[in-house]
Amino acid sequence: MRKGIYLRIALIAFTVILAIIFFLPNTPLFSYMPGWWKKNLPHKGIVLGLDLRGGSHLIFEVDLKRAREITVERIGMHLQSLLEKKGLKPSVKVQGEKIFIQPVNEDVKKIIKENYADLSISEHGGNIICELPETAFKRVETTSVEQAIEVIRNRIDQLGVAEPAIHKQGENEIVVQLPGVKDPKKALEIIGKTAQLEFKLLDEETTLWKQLPSLIKAGEEDTFLNQWKSKLPESDEIVFQKIVNKETGEVYKRPYIVKKDVLLTGDLLAEAHVSIDQRFNEPYVSLRFNDAGAKIFEDITGKYVKRRLAIILDGNLYSAPVIQEKIEGGNAQISGSFTLEEAKDLAIVLRAGALPAPVKLIQNVTVGPTLGKDSIEAGKMAVIIASIFVSLFMIIYYRLSGVIADFALILNIILLIGALAALNATLTLPGIAGIALAVGMAVDSNVLMFERIREELRLGKTPKAAIETGYKKAFWTIFDSHVTTLITAAVLFHFGSGPIKGFAVTLSLGVAINLFTALIGTKTVFDFIYIGKERKSLSI
């Protein structure tokens, strides 16, 4: 009997020491610890959530429909190039998720089957129609979200944000948490920019240039496009270049007619960095393509000498220089009315790679560091006040047994904080609410046991026998209530978002630790007091 009690005391002491070791990195004392301690023992501790230390919580939605269309467009481009190399010059057009090839040719069908086994081929109205099966599109959707996560992660890494959290949510949503970010607006612009870099030829042969206005006001692009849609050849489209009046600051858009066919994309970029034009002292973005991109760029510039090549990023034309000669080495540049910061941001998104499809911001919650600090203080105060009032009530109502319950309460808080630190859990404001709830539940368990003990004492049992019977009878009631709470917490964790998950984690840990402190902690104290002694009364 005595040996069993001492073993339980040793177990409690061990768990307390372990909890303190794990929580130590979150205290000022950690800075005084020797080097060997920091190297060999836990050094991370509890991570504060965005609502406590400030930062941005962003949710992006990947445009999966556009991802499907982009995939088909790329296949169409590749087929066009492939067929031309084979000496065939069919018309290849992409409409939505279908590729139309004219004329119908058995050699063309054979080349398609050899290179794209997934494509289903049919004939209709003098066209070869190519389509991807739904299974292939599902792979495209999954891959697009995964690639978008990687691209966003690369961009955030270049921003230098410490401990960002990025993960998939649902089918096509990406959750991005940026703790302590100083410029949320800039971060949002860099993360959300699609960075689809495209090189297209200007259509210099069309007579529509004479009717085209030199400038339109910014914001009138949609109206302008609707007016011109019916006038354009099927193979052309209009893109705009941003023009800023340096004197007034007014923004205008200059329309250009370009070919829809994409000659080269930013997928083949190897490097992008900011350079300064020595003649005009203006920044520009210098590009270098990889070997495959350099070869394509060389072919383009060799084939279209004296033609204007439009450099388009996310649908906006940046420049349209005249190709003077074949360019070898795969070097190009994007110039425009950049500030140095704008050029740097553009280089970042190009270096990190293009998003596989456009992303749309559907939620943006930004918490300032001051508000986060206030939340921590308010949360601390709530837990402290709750603990004090609960402790006083227990002492007044249950006397010495109330003191034992308060010991269990302190033990519960120490072990809970230690467990959170051991898991490197992210503590949010709802998480603090979970701690406060765990405090209430810890006391609730003791109340159940103490009332059972009182009932046994009224039946005439000795204090020692009343304690034993009271604990046995209360055990299953306490156990059942805690298991049902754990089930609820598990559901919250599975279906909830970040803050709700934080609440679920602290609640789950609190429930598990509460079982330990209530059924082992307080029982050990009672056994220690009454070991080898038969007291006639019990302060309860």
UniProtKB/Swiss-Prot annotation:
UniProt topology in membrane: Multi-pass membrane protein
The keyword Ribonucleoprotein belongs to this UniProt entry's keyword annotation: no
Top-rank taxon: Bacteria
InterPro entries, A to Z: Acrflvin-R, SecD, SecD/SecF_arch_bac, SecD/SecF_CS, SecD_1st, SecD_SecF_C, SecD_SecF_C_bact, SecDF_P1_head
Keyword annotations of the record: Cell inner membrane, Cell membrane, Membrane, Protein transport, Translocation, Transmembrane, Transmembrane helix, Transport
GO biological process terms, semicolon-separated: intracellular protein transmembrane transport; protein targeting; protein transport; protein transport by the Sec complex
Cellular component aspect of the GO annotation: plasma membrane
Compartment annotation: Cell inner membrane
Keyword Plastid attributed: no
Stretches that traverse the bilayer: 4-24, 376-396, 403-423, 430-450, 475-495, 502-522
A Pfam family of this chain: SecD_SecF_C
UniProt similarity note: Belongs to the SecD/SecF family. SecD subfamily.
HAMAP family (alphabetical): SecD_B (MF_01463_B)
Stated role: Part of the Sec protein translocase complex. Interacts with the SecYEG preprotein conducting channel. SecDF uses the proton motive force (PMF) to complete protein translocation after the ATP-dependent function of SecA.
Subunit structure: Forms a complex with SecF. Part of the essential Sec protein translocation apparatus which comprises SecA, SecYEG and auxiliary proteins SecDF. Other proteins may also be involved.
Name the record gives this protein: Protein translocase subunit SecD
Originating species: Thermodesulfovibrio yellowstonii (strain ATCC 51303 / DSM 11347 / YP87)
Gene: secD
